[in-house]
């Protein structure tokens, strides 16, 4: 199976390349692309790690050589958030980058599963869908917004707060991938009892965790290492699914439109990408209200992406 990483010279991309070289199944191929001339060097560097994963690096304006015969494409290209910016400030730059790359995906590997990491994910996934649709190759089972970092953060913070073994914690996170659209379903976490005054602050911390990192890095970037681990976890689950195993991950996909055209929720991954979108389950009163409150924001984010391509 061939996995292409677009944006492989960036903070997320380099760490993601390392994690995939270490963890992809033997016999996999890893293809790294970035506009930056350092990219073949990143591939050379990572290639010295002794695992049975072949790796190649490509630089320059044209991602097509990196995309040929790809089964999975992960897009992390774009600019990172700096203090004072929110994810929507990234839109003006990253929207064009994602559009251009997806046009090349549509031409070169239209049947590949595509995972969008580039923020604002709520919007960039809609851009990708519209570009693929215009090219006549859109298959909603094969397009994903990678929201796994919200799950990782939720698992970490719940374990810390409750003094639990983090490996036993699973937290479904639904909605979108910015601010109020991130909704961890804490009421569904096993082995935990919640006090009234714990839920709202913890939810807010999960929603604002990206900003926490941006501020802590003091202008030196945004969450890259934890994001790379999240993307690696998602990519490895996707590869398992494509290989015929049953795996469930929360991810931002086009479903039945019950809440919004794109919505993050638990998804069973399989040989065609999305095998089945699973129900969100029973929500607490707090979660139900948070869900209703976020929908106008989420729908507006999606519409922004659709209009970017169609107007």
Curated annotation (Swiss-Prot):
Catalytic reaction(s) noted: (S)-malate + NAD(+) = oxaloacetate + NADH + H(+)
EC number, as in UniProt: 1.1.1.37
Keyword tRNA processing listed? The answer is no
Protein's UniProt keywords contain Oxidoreductase: yes
Which controlled-vocabulary keywords does the entry list? NAD, Oxidoreductase, Tricarboxylic acid cycle
Q: Which residues bind substrate?
A: 81, 87, 119, 153
What GO annotations for molecular function exist for this entry? L-malate dehydrogenase (NAD+) activity
This protein's GO CC annotations:
cytoplasm
Q: What InterPro entries is this protein classified in?
A: L-lactate/malate_DH (IPR001557), Lactate/malate_DH_C (IPR022383), Lactate/malate_DH_N (IPR001236), Lactate_DH/Glyco_Ohase_4_C (IPR015955), Malate_DH_AS (IPR001252), Malate_DH_type1 (IPR010097), Malate_DH_type1_bac (IPR023958), NAD(P)-bd_dom_sf (IPR036291)
Task: Give residues annotated as binding NAD(+).
Answer: 7-13, 34, 94, 117-119, 227
Q: Name one GO biological process term.
A: tricarboxylic acid cycle
Active-site residues, as the UniProt record annotates them: 177 (proton acceptor)
Q: Which NCBIfam families does the annotation name?
A: MDH_euk_gproteo
Annotated function: Catalyzes the reversible oxidation of malate to oxaloacetate.
The family line of this record is: Belongs to the LDH/MDH superfamily. MDH type 1 family.
- Give the matching PANTHER family: MALATE AND LACTATE DEHYDROGENASE (PTHR11540), MALATE DEHYDROGENASE, MITOCHONDRIAL (PTHR11540:SF16)
The record's subunit annotation is: Homodimer.
- The identity of this protein, by name, is Malate dehydrogenase
Q: Which gene encodes it?
A: mdh
């Amino acid at each position: 199976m061939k996995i292409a990483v677009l944006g492989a010279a960036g903070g997320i991309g380099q760490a993601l390349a390392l994690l995939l070289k270490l963890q992809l199944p033997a016999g996999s191929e890893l293809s790294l692309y970035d506009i930056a001339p350092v990219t073949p060097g990143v591939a050379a560097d990572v290639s010295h790690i002794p695992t049975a994963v072949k790796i190649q690096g490509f630089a320059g304006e044209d991602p097509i050589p990196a995309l040929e015969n790809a089964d999975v494409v992960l897009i992390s290209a774009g600019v990172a958030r700096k203090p004072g910016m929110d994810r929507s400030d990234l839109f003006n730059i990253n929207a064009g980058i994602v559009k251009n790359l997806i046009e090349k995906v549509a031409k070169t590997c239209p049947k590949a599963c595509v995972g969008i990491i580039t923020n604002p994910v709520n919007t960039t996934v809609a851009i990708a869908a519209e570009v693929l649709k215009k090219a006549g190759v859109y298959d909603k089972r094969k397009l994903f917004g990678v929201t796994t970092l919200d799950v990782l953060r939720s698992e970490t913070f719940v374990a810390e707060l409750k003094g639990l073994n983090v490996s036993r914690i699973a937290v479904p996170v639904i909605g979108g991938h910015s601010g109020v659209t991130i909704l961890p379903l804490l009421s569904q976490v096993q082995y935990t009892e919640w006090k009234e005054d714990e839920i709202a602050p913890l939810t807010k911390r999960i929603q604002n965790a990206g900003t926490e990192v941006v501020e802590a890095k003091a202008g030196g970037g945004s969450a890259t290492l934890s994001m790379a681990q999240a993307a690696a976890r998602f990519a490895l689950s996707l590869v398992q699914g494509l290989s015929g195993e049953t795996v469930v991950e929360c991810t931002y996909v086009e479903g039945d439109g019950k809440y919004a055209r794109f919505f993050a929720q638990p998804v069973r991954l399989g040989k065609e990408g999305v095998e089945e979108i699973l129900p969100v389950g029973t929500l607490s009163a707090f979660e139900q209200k948070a869900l209703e409150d976020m929908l106008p924001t989420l729908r507006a984010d999606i519409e922004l992406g659709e209009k970017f391509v169609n107007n």
